[in-house]
């Protein structure tokens, strides 16, 4: 839905907004963006920050000093959604004494709630779903004209028109596919992010070439279900397969000069193919790190979740990855206490975590979400069970992660320096190819100083469950 509310109420056609040129008026105010949730939201926030800066806004030093406050929201868990309402309440009270404040809610909560948000928080100026991130300037033009705007209609996502204001100068998110066509029974994403929309390989490569020209060294290709990339694009090869797949995209962008590392997330076991695994092995820039959610280690629970694969298939994927890339890191997402999950089924999840030996696990207790089948089921588990199972899982995850990291003690790992350690300014921090957070001294042998963007060989001398520390060696590859 797209509505623009004034006095009297007026309905503004979506097509008019999409085709009218955006305003060129320059704003002198400041903005603040608070991002909740996934990497897709972070990438959307970077694009919206770029749009605001192109409009003449500048970033405020603090949220309570901003003339425009934008919350890019997440609805994947109830606690994230409630946090948003807490922030909004504070800003709504502020607006009563600062009437020129613009208050914007973007992202998945905006898409889910739509006009209901205006009824709950009438101080809002703009409610916009994630498909409208690139339309921010045109939407704010309506706000400048004194209207309250709700933009939650299912739209084709415009190609990026404004340079994103990146939070990093080293590593960049690159959206390659938006939306999700899966129908997992617990997940609200398809209803708030819409159907899959793949960007063209040419547009993606052009963006990456621009990033390389600006000095970026690492890119992460993003999608809610990135292995589905290209399903909506035309073209069939002589062999009868789709012409545009994630595997083809990796080959298409691999030779962009200046980009040293390529990652991608998030994968779905249902679409993670042998051909993709072999491409990751063959292409030297693709990092040996794979984020593949398994959600549950029990086949009956997976069936209830409508995930479309079995534990056996997941094992085959992991085994093949490690057959070709023995040191590859595998991270995952897990949900415990799904409706009806028994003690034995939960134990199957624990068993799989230990068997696979995950390097990192994003854990969560099941949270009923609006407009999802699982939220309506009668076999919901009590909160005390959720808390206890999550506690058990987290303890196991930390133990397994420490075991995995212990293998690196004494080894030399190549680290891409991303910035200064905020707790120890004399240190830099970065990540290995396997995505391990690593800290090391900014000054190396023979008074050599390292900078963000350098690729530094670091000898690991201390390991923790979720980070490594070490000493720089002589070898380094400068960013410049």
UniProtKB/Swiss-Prot annotation:
Catalytic activity as recorded in UniProt: N(6)-dimethylallyladenosine(37) in tRNA + (sulfur carrier)-SH + AH2 + 2 S-adenosyl-L-methionine = 2-methylsulfanyl-N(6)-dimethylallyladenosine(37) in tRNA + (sulfur carrier)-H + 5'-deoxyadenosine + L-methionine + A + S-adenosyl-L-homocysteine + 2 H(+)
GO MF annotation: an example: 4 iron, 4 sulfur cluster binding
Domain MTTase N-terminal, chain residue ranges per copy: 29-145
CDD domains, per database record: Radical_SAM
Binding residues for [4Fe-4S] cluster 1: 38, 74, 108
Binding site for [4Fe-4S] cluster 2: 180, 184, 187
Cofactor note text: Binds 2 [4Fe-4S] clusters. One cluster is coordinated with 3 cysteines and an exchangeable S-adenosyl-L-methionine.
Domain of life: Bacteria
Record localization: Cytoplasm
One Gene Ontology biological process: tRNA methylthiolation
EC number: 2.8.4.3
UniProt xrefs under InterPro entries: Elp3/MiaA/NifB-like_rSAM (IPR006638), Methylthiotransferase (IPR005839), Methylthiotransferase_CS (IPR020612), Methylthiotransferase_N (IPR013848), Methylthiotransferase_N_sf (IPR038135), MiaB_methiolase (IPR006463), rSAM (IPR007197), rSAM_horseshoe (IPR023404)
Quaternary state and interactors: Monomer.
Family: Belongs to the methylthiotransferase family. MiaB subfamily.
Annotated HAMAP family: tRNA_metthiotr_MiaB
Listed name of the protein: tRNA-2-methylthio-N(6)-dimethylallyladenosine synthase
Organism, scientific name: Prochlorococcus marinus (strain MIT 9303)
């Amino acid at each position: 839905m797209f509505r623009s509310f004034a006095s009297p109420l007026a309905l503004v056609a979506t097509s008019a907004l999409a085709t009218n040129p955006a305003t060129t008026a320059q704003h002198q105010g400041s903005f603040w963006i608070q991002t909740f949730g996934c990497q897709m939201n972070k990438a959307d926030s970077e694009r919206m920050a770029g749009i605001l800066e192109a409009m003449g806004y500048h970033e405020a030093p603090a949220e309570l000093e901003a003339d425009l406050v934008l919350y890019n929201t997440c609805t994947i868990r109830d606690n994230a959604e409630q946090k948003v309402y807490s922030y909004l309440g504070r800003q709504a009270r502020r607006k009563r004494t600062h009437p020129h404040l613009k208050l914007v809610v973007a992202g998945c909560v905006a898409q889910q709630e739509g006009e209901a948000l205006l009824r709950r928080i009438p101080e809002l100026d703009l409610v916009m779903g994630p498909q409208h991130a690139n339309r921010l300037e045109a939407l704010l033009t309506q706000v400048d004209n004194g209207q309250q705007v709700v933009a939650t209609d299912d739209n084709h996502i415009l190609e990026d028109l404004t340079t994103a204001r990146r939070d990093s100068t080293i590593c960049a998110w690159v959206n390659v596919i938006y939306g999700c066509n899966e129908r997992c029974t617990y997940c609200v994403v398809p209803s708030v992010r819409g159907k899959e929309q793949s960007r063209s390989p040419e547009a993606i490569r052009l963006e990456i070439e621009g990033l390389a020209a600006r000095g970026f060294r690492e890119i992460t290709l993003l999608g809610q279900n990135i292995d589905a990339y290209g399903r909506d694009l035309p073209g069939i090869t002589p062999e009868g397969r789709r012409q545009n797949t994630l595997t083809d995209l990796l080959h298409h962008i691999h030779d962009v000069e200046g980009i040293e590392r390529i990652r991608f997330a998030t994968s779905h076991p249902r679409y993670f193919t042998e051909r993709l695994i072999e491409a990751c092995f063959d292409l030297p820039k693709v990092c040996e790190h794979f984020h593949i959610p398994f959600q549950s280690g029990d086949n009956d629970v997976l069936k209830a979740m409508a995930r479309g694969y079995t534990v056996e298939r997941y094992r085959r994927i992991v085994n093949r990855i490690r057959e070709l890339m023995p040191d590859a890191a595998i991270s995952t997402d897990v949900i415990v206490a799904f409706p009806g999950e028994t003690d034995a089924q939960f134990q199957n999840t624990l068993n799989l975590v230990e068997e696979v030996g995950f390097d990192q696990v994003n854990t969560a207790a099941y949270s009923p979400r609006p407009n999802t089948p699982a939220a309506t089921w009668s076999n919901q588990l009590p909160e005390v069970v959720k808390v206890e199972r999550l506690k058990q899982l987290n303890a196991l995850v930390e133990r397994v992660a420490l075991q995995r990291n212990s293998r690196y003690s004494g080894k030399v790992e190549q680290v891409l320096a991303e910035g200064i350690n905020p707790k120890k300014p004399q240190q830099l921090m970065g990540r290995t190819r396997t995505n391990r957070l690593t800290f090391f001294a900014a000054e190396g042998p023979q008074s050599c100083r390292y900078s963000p963007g350098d690729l530094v060989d670091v000898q690991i001398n201390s390991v923790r469950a979720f980070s490594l520390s070490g000493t720089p060696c002589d070898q380094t590859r400068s960013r410049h």
